[in-house]
Each structure stands twice: as structure tokens, then as C-alpha cells.
Amino acid sequence: MEKVIELNPDIMPMRIALANRYFEAFDYSSALPHFMYVAENSNDIDLKSLSLSQIGWMVYESGDVNTSLNYINEALRISPKSLLAETYKGIILIQQTDTRDEGILILNSLRNNPSLSEEDLSIIEEILEIYES
């Protein structure tokens, strides 16, 4: 698929599909250039927000909370209703002692969102159970 993307670099949904495949396999070094390309070159707000959210999560996984939140906040600035960005933000904030209450508020508000998948709801509820007790 890399060859196809190389020949068609601006087909953003295809690039996102490949980046997400890498992301889900925790191959962040392969996912990052594709998400960065979309974040920098796409005019599609949803794809740009998704890319920024995924970049933010990868940065968080590398241990840089502040930079990760910068990416996620930018994703929310351009797409305020992004469930992915909001979920990542809540998960990151709940794990930090000084922002735990804000994280709990975010994740509790997401619980009631009918657009949230059952799988994501289950993850959020597990996280809340850990930090609310």
C-alpha cells in the first residue's frame, strides 16, 4: 500500500487507512509520517482532526504529556465534537494527579454520548472505575 500512496499522495482517506493500520499495530514510526502529511495537507477538517488526535496519542505514549495535549487541543479546536480527541484528552488528564478531576468530567460526559461505540464506552467505564474509586 505504501507504493500506492507514493503514487497518489493526496488521497487522504487511503493514507489515513494505512496510518491507522500501522497505529493499531503500535508501529508508530510508520504511522507518524502519514498522519503528519494529512494534518499538514488535508482540507478535510475531520481527517485533519483525526490525524492530530492520533499524533497526540502517539506523543503521549512516548511520554510527552504537554506536547500530546497541544496536538489534541488543536484537533478539538478545528473539530470541537471530535469523540476521538475528547476521549484521548479525558484519558490523558485522568491519569495526571493535577488534572484528574477534569479528566473525570470529560469521560463522564462522553459516557452519555450516543455516538460512542460500545467498545469505547467499555474502555471509558473501566478507566473511570479505576480513578473514581
Regions found by a protein language model. Give the residues of each.
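Conserved structural position within tetratricopeptide repeats
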Residues: 2-6, 40-43, 73-77, 112
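Residue-level detector of the short coil/turn that links helix A to helix B
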Residues: 26, 63, 97-98
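Single-residue signature of alpha-solenoid repeat helices
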Residues: 31, 68, 102-103
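Canonical tetratricopeptide repeat
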Residues: 17, 51-54, 88, 123-127
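Residue-level recognition of tetratricopeptide repeat
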Residues: 11, 82, 116-117
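Terminal, low-structured helical/coil segments at or just beyond the last alpha-helical repeat
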Residues: 98-133
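TPR alpha-solenoid repeat register
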Residues: 14, 48-51, 85, 120
